Amino acid sequence: MSYKKIIPYINGENELAANVVMQAEQYCFAGADALFLYNYSKIEAEREEFLATLKEVAEKIDIPFMAGMYMERFEDAKKVFYTGAEKIVVKYDLVKDESLLKEMIARFGSDKILVEVDADIDFDKIPLHVDTFLVKHVDIDAEFERKMMRAGKQIIIRDSLL
């Protein structure tokens, strides 16, 4: 059976932690099914700050959230889960070493690691054993529908409602 969820996303890049937490609370109170928070900064200090923000968010909301973050080493993934995140989203075009991604999938499960891709690439041909792709910048046309069917995975479409 097909179903839809409302999963707002919050870009934590260059944003005050208090603003991210407040926005997460507002989405939670407004009836969101889950949240997707991300900060793909490659700067270590900014990633650590984002992890602290995720911990604050986890204390304030009662819905699951996914966290997107630049992964440099396996410990980064463990840190994300320690914040209370239900799933990790890895941006495919930032992956330097697919063996890290494969290790994360083997350790945490294919249902806990999502891969974020642009709709214009052939995501259906990515040889990773994940259950879900998060696809951004989507124009739903016949070619996109064919890719979705060939991928044989769950697809979350990340798009602005505005």
What are these regions (language model features)?
Residues 1-65, 71-75, 79, 113-115, ...:
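Conserved N-terminal beta1-alpha1 strand-loop-helix module at the mouth
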Residues 40-42, 79-100, 132-144, 154-162:
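Glycine-rich phosphate-binding active-site loops on the catalytic face of alpha/beta enzymes
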Residues 104-105:
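Extended substrate/RNA-proximal surfaces in nucleic-acid metabolism proteins
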